């Protein structure tokens, strides 16, 4: 987002514990001790835990079980501010802006998205605990002091993007519930009178029925929607069944954003460069925010889960890449 004369990135910083040897896997978590939040370390020894799967660098799980049986994450994430005068060269603050609390974020904070409404910046983010990944809300006016508003979407629900103004008297947000049985991770749209209490949920968009498509695995919110003379533009992410993440875009009706006017058939950004295909979790481009200056769309995105990058588009080119839908 932009604040005064600076471009502000609110970055997820994932930190892990240095282990003594290759047999150890050390897990940082936040726990309440004598009324205070403290970081504690849980240590697994691979040789003593044959029932556990350590093959995924992101987490420890029960061997042979499904993803819902994750026991711990291997890192603990907080949110930290990076500042820039030109949108390219950033200085990262020395200390965290927001650190996880034991009650809501004992396993960390991820995927922050900033929506400016009037003079307040609302930050929704994924709050992770052993009970699942939900979405919480924080607000600020100056990026120095922050007010917590708690969980607004209970687990498992993430990839929330809030529209920057009321529509027909209510706040509107995309969200992405993750069903455990029937269904797939798909986009829903909800409404709220106050940004805290959300309801009127409606299914918005599902995954592609084409099993060879770039978006046949999962789909979710990306950047905060922005308004143009043609309607709302919503840049989103999707993945195929091999977890290759790309970005696409919707054009939505100004007065009813549940109506899709047009969408991109092919990705507008996909992992091609080495820094996008290789990394902590390769073949990923994933955005949580963008800026719009005149006809230019500036997307800040994560690459391979361990870098932050920038890509610029002409808005006219984005519209030209869309296929319009008969309503």
Residue ranges of model-derived segments:
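Beta-rich carbohydrate-recognition and catalytic domains
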Residues: 2-107, 115-161, 165-217, 227-280, ...
